[in-house]
Amino acid sequence: MASGKATGKTDAPAPVIKLGGPKPPKVGSSGNASWFQAIKAKKLNSPPPKFEGSGVPDNENLKPGQQHGYWRRQARFKPSKGGRKPVPDAWYFYYTGTGPAADLNWGDSQDGIVWVAAKGADVKSRSNQGTRDPDKFDQYPLRFSDGGPDGNFRWDFIPLNRGRSGRSTAASSAASTRAPSREGSRGRRSGSEDDLIARAAKIIQDQQRKGSRITKAKADEMAHRRYCKRTIPPGYKVDQVFGPRTKGKEGNFGDDKMNEEGITDGRVTAMLNLVPSSHACLFGSRVTPKLQPDGLHLKFEFTTVVPRDDPQFDNYVKICDQCIDGVGTRPKDDEPKPKSRSSSRPATRTSSPAPRQQRSKKEKKPKKQDDEVDKALTSAEERTNAQLEFDDEPKVINWGDSALGENEL
């Protein structure tokens, strides 16, 4: 019978790791930029924005009485053959008493200014939030708990857990990722279920294309490392690396479509955004060791919480419904189409038709990127446009470095 001091082990449940990100600083800096990312008009000469709710971005650091400010129009231009041409305006939020219109009182009439206030806000008070120094702080992602701008405006999705390292990732993604335009309000919770998966897959493909090529030997090494360190190389199926998909036990994530497409399935990229890092898994999990005849088995129990107000909440729920115990199934929108009578016949030497000559497709010239917007501007315009960060198309999304698994590759 063993005796001695307690080993320090506990049966207490593992901590719940919640999704989130850096909070907006409570005190401003010497910069004069908005703390928040911009909303952008979809068309030239769009009217000022109208909001379903208060129009004040979420900021849990402020009391309800301080939740008031103004949206200010920022004219934008981009270079063209004739010099430059205007592009749809951007609108930035500032708290009352801060920013370019710091001398105005709440409600003072001025062109290009839209005043907003939350319920119960003391609009006679002036904020001590200050403004942002772009060299020290990133823009804080926009979230509206009570409704965002009308359908004439959109904004780019920025994850709440993006750090400063996310700026270069977002810029590189913006430079290479362009997707078709869509209808509906950009960034609203109700419009976030459209083609997020396709955008995520596009980012992965573009980064693979831009990065160093993975040789056949490297891919084979990635797929045959120690099991817990394996990653799926391009062109590999899930079951080639992690074994057949199952139900009700380990290896139960992934439907037939995900198994076939591997990492090119955008749902993989989306869910990697919720997977814990190595450190989080080790220090945030409940670790259970068990000696077995074949060796030591370590079990890691980890919980990631996706808040219900997360813009991608419905997408994560949908992916889980499709992929957990999903072997033998496919997404409803990916059911194989029935083959026509002529194409369903097996081809033979005598009956196979001669292949039609394919027309060569013209290569599309890459469009000029929006990050050239500040070129050919005067020094004064450069200063006023200094805060135009993350000036991406509606389809650009940055999942963050951890979601792309670059440390594993």
UniProtKB/Swiss-Prot annotation:
Keyword annotations from UniProtKB, A to Z: ADP-ribosylation, Disulfide bond, Host Golgi apparatus, Phosphoprotein, Ribonucleoprotein, RNA-binding, Transcription, Transcription regulation, Viral nucleoprotein, Virion
PTM annotation: ADP-ribosylated. The ADP-ribosylation is retained in the virion during infection. Phosphorylated on serine and threonine residues.
One Gene Ontology cellular component annotation held by this UniProt entry: host cell Golgi apparatus
Name of protein: Nucleoprotein
Feature: compositional bias, Basic and acidic residues: 180-192, 247-258
Span list, region Dimerization: 226-333
Domain CoV N NTD: 31-156
Segments of this protein annotated with the region RNA-binding: 29-160
Gene: N
